[in-house]
Amino acid sequence: MIRINHIQHQFGDHRVIDDFNLNIEKGKIVTFLGKSGCGKSTMLNIIGGFLTPSSGTVKIEDQLKQNPSPDCLMIFQHHNLLPWKNINDNIRLGLNREMSDGEINNYLKYVDLDHKGKTFPEQLSGGMKQRVALCRAQVHQPKVILMDEPLGALDAFTRYKLQDQLVQLQKQSTATIILVTHDIDEAIYLSDHIILLGDGCNIISQYSIEQSHSRNRNDSYLLTLRNNIMEKFALNHHQAEPEYYI
């Protein structure tokens, strides 16, 4: 369980987050959906302990979150792999147990990168590097995976492929995944829950995706949901709502 209570944050005189409250159940994929500059990435960094809020608290399994730690793993739009280390060694970074190249290769198979362990990041495409990031998340088994526009810089084919692999990653782990995006289709396909945000990170609305629809991109229910979200997105109401439990 992640409990976010009365988070406010400002940079100088500019308040980025007004008063954010949310409870997130363990093992869900939750998406913060909103336009650029609404504060969603700032909120993600606060949840991960990478940024101290002006006020308010974040608790993960009742433990106050104030600093980065191995229980939270961040995946960015642009990879943060170390260029002088091969893929196996990048995956091992920060791991609290020994893991052989063969064991890592078994994980790399899940993201179609088997036998790439001795390769260096510069030899991989952007999509491959993001697949390494997903593999690292699977190996490290954090409690929370935070993803800030992880697929935004990729072409459509690679993006769809990685979306499918992200869904598989979530099925094979107990991690809670929080995704930041401004892409409505990506949010609908990946999420158990969508939090639609306006300026100041104010919650406009929230949606639960019915699992019976199995993330079928052409499902009529999901198409109706998409139209509903697009309408709310366009209206961009900024009124804060009470704390949600999801």
What are the residue ranges of the model-derived segments?
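The feature captures the beta-strand-to-loop junction immediately N-terminal to the Walker
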Residues: 33-35
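Helix-to-loop junction immediately C-terminal to a conserved catalytic motif
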Residues: 48
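Conserved ABC transporter NBD signature motif
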Residues: 56-68
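Conserved ABC ATPase "signature" region
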Residues: 99-116, 167-168
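Conserved signature/switch motifs of ABC ATPase nucleotide-binding domains
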Residues: 122, 140
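Hydrophobic anchor residue at the start of the ABC signature
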Residues: 134
